[in-house]
C-alpha cells in the first residue's frame, strides 16, 4: 500500500506512527472512523486501540476503556533494527538493495539518521566503511509495490530497495518521510547567505520572551488541570444524585447510559490529569536545573572570553619581547623589512590599547628585493638549450598586442574596527557562515583570487614544450608553488561569491589563455574553474573552501583536485592545495603561512613530485616559507630535487647517483650538482605603493577593472565589491546585506518549489550550475564540476538570456 494510501486510512499524528511501528505478531488492524478498533494478534493490540481512539474516539465497551490505558511501548524496527519511534528521525535495519543484473538484490545494513540514509555491507562495517549516503532533504521516495520502494535525489544516486514484508516496507517509508520532512525544515531554517546570523540582542530578547510565554502556558496548564479535576468530581456527584431520584424507567435507562459515558470520561480525564501532573512536576523540576546550568554556562563563557583576551595580550607582549631580544632574518614574518624602510610604512608600532582593535591589516613593513623580475631559462633543465623560452619575435608580438591595463586602484581607507567584538563569537565555527563587514575584505571575490593562480601561466607554456616528462613535471611543480606567492601579504578576506556568480579573464591576445570561474555551490561554498591556452594546455579545478577560527589563528583548508592537461602529449597531472594559516588574529601583526604536502601525479607516465611546505617557526634556523621537493619516476628513482620558498623562487637540481663502496649506485640518488641548478620561477616585484592597495600584484590590480561584454553575473558588476574598492565602505556594507537577503529569498523559493514537487509526487531538479556540469571525473573518479562549454560563444553573440539575476 502506498504511503499516501496509508495516511488516508489512519489519519495524521503520532498515533498513526505508533501503529506502524507496532511490534506484534501481525500488523495492527485500523479501526473505522466511528468507534471500536480491534487490534491484530499479539502485542499489536495496544497499537490498534490507540489508532481507533485517534480515528474516531473511544467506542463503548472494553475497546473504549483501553484507549485510556497506558501508551504502548516504543515500536521496534523490522529485521532487528531500531524503529522510527516517536520522532521518526532514526532507524536502522536490513534491507535488500538492487546492485546489478548479475547479483540482483543484495542484503545491506541501512542506517537512517539526521536526514541521511547510509548503507553498509554489514552492521560491523559501520565503524570504518560507508558504502553510500543519500541526503533525504532533496530526495524523492516512491513506493513501487507491497515490498519495493525507490529513493532518488534526481541525480547520480538512486536506491532500489526491497523490504521483507509490506509492514516492514511501510515502517521504513514512514520513517523516511518523517526524516525527510525534518531535514527539509532544518534546511529551510538554515541561512543561505553564506553568513550565518549571530545571536544578536534582538534574538536574545525574543528568546527571553519565548521562555516567559512557555512559563505562562505551563501555569495555565496547571490551572486547567485543577479545574478539570474539580468540575469532573462535581459532574459525577450530580449524576449520582440524579440517578437516586425516582424517575420513569425510560429516563432511568437514559441516565444510566449518561452515567456510563461520564464514567468513561472520568477514566480518560484522570489519565490525562495524571499525565499532565507528571509533566508539570518534571518540567518544574528540570526548569530550575536548566536555569542554573544556563547561568553557569553564561558565567563560564564570560570568564573564557576574558581569559582568552588576556592570554592574547600576553602572547603579543612575549612576541615583542622576543623580537627585541633576538635578531631575526629579514624575511621572517615577525620582522619583514629593515629599519630604513620604516619611514615608508606610514605608521609606527601600535600601542597596547590599539591592539584589541587591530584589524586584518597586512604587515606594515616590507623589503622588496632588487631586480626581482620573472627570469626565464631554457626548457632543458640541465641548462644546455633554450627551446622553451619565448624567442625575441614572439616577445615583440606580445608587447605590441598587449592591452594597457590599470596599474593602481583607490588606496585602502584607514577604518578602525573592534576585531575582538566580532571574532570572539566565531571560535570553532565555519567562517563562511559568519556575517562579516566588508572591513575584513579586499575588493576581489574568491573567483578572482582563484584566477590569480594563472599569474605565472608562462610556466605552463614552457612545460607544454618540454619533451621530457620529468622536466615537464618540474615546471608544473614550480607553477603549483607560484600560486601561493600572492598570499604572502594578502591577509584580507575575499568576498564570498553569490550562487551563480561568474568571473571571466580573457587574455587570449596578450598571453594566449582565457579563464572562466563560476560559483557552483553555496553551502558548502564551491567554485569551478576552467582555463585553456592556445599554447597547449588546459587547467581545471573545483575548490571548496572550509575555514575554522581557532582563537589564535585561522585555518583555511581548500578541498578539491586541480587538473592540468597538456594537449600534445596527453600528460594529465593532478594535485591538491595545502592548508593556509593566518596567525595573530586577535592581536599582533597578522602573517600567513602555508604548510603541508602536495603530491603531483602524471597519470599517463606514473611520474610523481612530492612538495613539502615547511611550517614557519620562530625557533627554527631554516629559511622562512621553505619548500622542498623531489621528482621521481614510476620506480621511485629520484631524478630532480626542488628547493626554494613559496613567496620568492623555486630552483631545481639534477640528481646524480652516488657510486657506492661496491661500485653500485647508493640509494639511486646523490649530490645536487651545483652546475645543474636551474631557476624555474622567481616572483615578480609588487607594484609601487602596493601596501596601500591591499598588496595586490600587477595581475590582481587588473582583475576588477570594468570590461564591456561580460556576463551580467560577472564579479566586476557586483555592487558591494565595487563600492568597497572605491572606498565607500558604509554603502558597501548596506549593499552586501541587500544582496545576501536577495540570495536568501531565492533559496527559500527553490525550497518551496522542491517541497511542492515532493507533495505532488513530481520530480524536481535541484539547482544546477550554468556553465559547468557535475559528473564523475574520468581520471580521479570524483564527482566534480567540468566546463560544459558555450560561455565564449554566448559572449560573442551577447546572448545572456540564461543568466540568473543575482545582483
Curated annotation (Swiss-Prot):
InterPro entries per record: OSBP_sf, Oxysterol-bd, Oxysterol-bd_CS, PH-like_dom_sf, PH_domain
Tissues and organs where the protein is expressed, per its UniProt entry: Widely expressed.
Residues modified to N-acetylalanine: 2
Residue positions binding cholesterol: 314
Gene Ontology molecular functions: oxysterol binding; phosphatidylinositol-4-phosphate binding; protein domain specific binding; sterol binding; sterol transfer activity
UniProt domain PH: residue ranges: 88-181
GO cellular component, one term: nucleoplasm
CDD domains assigned to the protein according to its UniProt record, in alphabetical order: PH_OSBP_ORP4 (cd13284)
Compositional bias (Gly residues): 77-86
Impact noted for substituting residue 108 to L: Impaired lipid exchange activity. Induces a shift in subcellular location to the endoplasmic reticulum
Domain of life: Eukaryota
Annotated motif FFAT, positions: 358-364
Location (main, coarse): cytoplasm
Chain residues that bind 7beta-hydroxycholesterol: 314
Entry coiled-coil feature ranges: 291-326, 730-760
Annotated residues for binding of ergosterol: 314
Family as reported in the entry's similarity comment: Belongs to the OSBP family.
Name assigned to this protein: Oxysterol-binding protein 1
Amino acid at each position: 500500500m502506498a504511503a499516501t494510501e496509508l495516511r488516508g486510512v489512519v489519519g495524521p499524528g503520532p498515533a498513526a506512527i505508533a501503529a506502524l511501528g507496532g511490534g506484534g505478531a501481525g500488523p495492527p488492524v485500523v479501526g473505522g472512523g466511528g468507534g471500536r478498533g480491534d487490534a491484530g494478534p499479539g502485542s499489536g493490540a495496544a497499537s490498534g486501540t490507540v489508532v481507533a481512539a485517534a480515528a474516531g474516539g473511544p467506542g463503548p465497551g472494553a475497546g473504549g476503556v483501553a484507549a485510556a490505558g497506558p501508551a504502548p511501548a516504543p515500536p521496534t524496527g523490522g529485521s532487528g533494527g531500531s524503529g522510527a519511534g516517536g520522532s521518526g528521525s532514526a532507524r536502522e535495519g536490513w534491507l535488500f538493495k538492487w546492485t546489478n543484473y548479475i547479483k540482483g538484490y543484495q542484503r545491506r545494513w541501512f542506517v537512517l539518521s539526521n536526514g541521511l540514509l547510509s548503507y553498509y555491507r554489514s552492521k560491523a562495517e559501520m565503524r570504518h566503511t560507508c558504502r553510500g549516503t543519500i541526503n533525504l532533504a532533496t530526495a524523492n521516495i516512491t513506493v513501487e509495490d507491497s515490498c519495493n520502494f525507490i529513493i532518488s535525489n534526481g541525480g547520480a544516486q538512486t536506491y532500489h530497495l526491497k523490504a521483507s514484508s509490506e509492514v516492514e516496507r511501510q515502517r521504513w517509508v514512514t520513517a523516511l518521510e518523517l526524516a525527510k520532512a525534518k531535514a527539509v525544515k532544518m534546511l529551510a531554517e538554515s541561512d543561505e547567505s553564506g553568513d550565518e546570523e549571530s545571536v544578536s540582542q534582538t534574538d536574545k530578547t525574543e528568546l527571553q520572551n519565548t521562555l516567559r510565554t512557555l512559563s505562562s502556558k505551563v501555569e495555565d496548564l496547571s490551572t486547567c488541570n485543577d479545574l478539570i479535576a474539580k468540575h469532573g468530581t462535581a459532574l459525577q456527584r450530580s449524576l449520582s444524585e440524579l440517578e437516586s431520584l425516582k424517575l420513569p424507567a425510560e429516563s432511568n435507562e437514559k441516565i444510566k447510559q449518561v452515567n456510563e459515558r461520564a464514567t468513561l470520561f472520568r477514566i480518560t480525564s484522570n489519565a490525562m490529569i495524571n499525565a499532565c501532573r507528571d509533566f508539570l512536576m518534571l518540567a518544574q523540576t528540570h526548569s530550575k536545573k536548566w536555569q542554573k546550568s544556563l547561568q553557569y554556562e553564561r558565567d563560564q563563557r564570560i570568564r573564557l572570553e576574558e581569559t582568552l583576551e588576556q592570554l592574547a595580550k600576553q602572547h603579543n607582549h612575549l612576541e615583542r619581547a622576543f623580537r627585541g631580544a633576538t635578531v631575526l632574518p629579514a624575511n621572517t614574518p615577525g620582522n619583514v623589512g629593515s629599519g630604513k624602510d620604516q619611514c615608508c610604512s606610514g605608521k609606527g608600532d601600535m600601542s597596547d590599547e590599539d591592539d584589541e582593535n587591530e584589524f586584518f591589516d597586512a604587515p606594515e613593513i616590507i623589503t622588496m628585493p632588487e631586480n626581482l623580475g620573472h627570469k626565464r631559462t631554457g626548457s632543458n633543465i640541465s641548462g644546455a638549450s633554450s627551446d622553451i623560452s619565448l624567442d625575441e619575435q614572439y616577445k615583440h608580438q606580445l608587447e605590441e598586442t598587449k592591452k594597457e591595463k590599470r596599474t593602481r586602484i583607490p588606496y585602502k581607507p584607514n577604518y578602525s574596527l573592534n576585531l575582538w567584538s566580532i571574532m570572539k563569537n566565531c571560535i570553532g565555527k565555519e567562517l563562511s557562515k559568519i556575517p562579516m563587514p566588508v572591513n575584513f575584505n579586499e575588493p576581489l571575490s574568491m573567483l578572482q583570487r582563484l584566477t590569480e593562480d594563472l599569474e605565472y601561466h608562462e610556466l605552463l607554456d614552457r612545460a607544454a614544450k618540454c619533451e621530457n616528462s620529468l622536466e615537464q613535471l618540474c615546471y608544473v611543480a614550480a607553477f603549483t608553488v607560484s600560486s601561493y606567492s600572492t598570499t604572502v601579504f594578502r591577509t584580507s578576506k575575499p568576498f564570498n561569491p553569490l550562487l551563480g556568480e561568474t568571473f571571466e579573464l580573457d587574455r587570449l591576445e596578450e598571453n594566449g589563455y582565457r579563464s572562466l570561474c563560476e560559483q557552483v555551490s553555496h553551502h558548502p561554498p564551491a567554485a569551478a574553474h576552467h582555463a585553456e591556452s592556445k599554447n597547449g594546455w588546459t587547467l581545471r579545478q573545483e575548490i571548496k573552501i572550509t575555514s575554522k577560527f581557532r582563537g589564535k589563528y585561522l585555518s583555511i583548508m581548500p578541498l578539491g583536485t586541480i587538473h592540468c592537461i597538456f594537449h600534445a602529449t596527453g600528460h594529465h597531472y593532478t594535485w591538491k592545495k595545502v592548508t593556509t594559516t593566518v596567525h595573530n588574529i586577535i592581536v599582533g601583526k597578522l602573517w600567513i603561512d602555508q604548510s603541508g604536502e602536495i603530491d603531483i601525479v602524471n597519470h599517463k607516465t606514473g611520474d610523481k613530485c612530492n612538495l613539502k611546505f615547511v611550517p614557519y617557526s620562530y625557533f627554527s634556523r631554516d629559511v622562512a616559507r621553505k619548500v622542498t621537493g623531489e621528482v621521481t619516476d614510476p620506480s621511485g628513482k629520484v631524478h630532480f630535487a626542488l628547493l626554494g620558498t613559496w613567496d620568492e623562487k623555486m630552483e631545481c637540481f639534477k640528481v646524480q647517483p652516488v657510486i657506492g663502496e661496491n661500485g653500485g649506485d647508493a640509494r639511486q640518488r646523490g649530490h645536487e650538482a651545483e652546475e645543474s641548478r636551474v631557476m624555474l620561477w622567481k616572483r615578480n616585484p609588487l607594484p609601487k605603493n602596493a601596501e596601500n592597495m591591499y598588496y595586490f600584484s600587477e595581475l590582481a590590480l587588473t582583475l576588477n577593472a570594468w570590461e564591456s561584454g561580460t556576463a551580467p553575473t560577472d564579479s566586476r558588476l557586483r555592487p558591494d565589491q565595487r563600492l568597497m574598492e572605491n572606498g565607500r565602505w558604509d554603502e558597501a556594507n548596506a549593499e552586501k546585506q541587500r544582496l545576501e537577503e536577495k540570495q536568501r529569498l531565492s533559496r527559500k523559493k527553490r525550497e518551496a518549489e522542491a517541497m511542492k514537487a515532493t507533495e505532488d509526487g513530481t520530480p524536481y531538479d535541484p539547482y544546477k550550475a550554468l556553465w559547468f556540469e557535475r559528473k564523475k571525473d574520468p581520471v580521479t573518479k570524483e564527482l566534480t564540476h567540468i566546463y560544459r562549454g558555450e560561455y565564449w560563444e554566448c559572449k560573442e553573440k551577447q546572448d545572456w538570456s540564461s543568466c540568473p539575476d543575482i545582483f
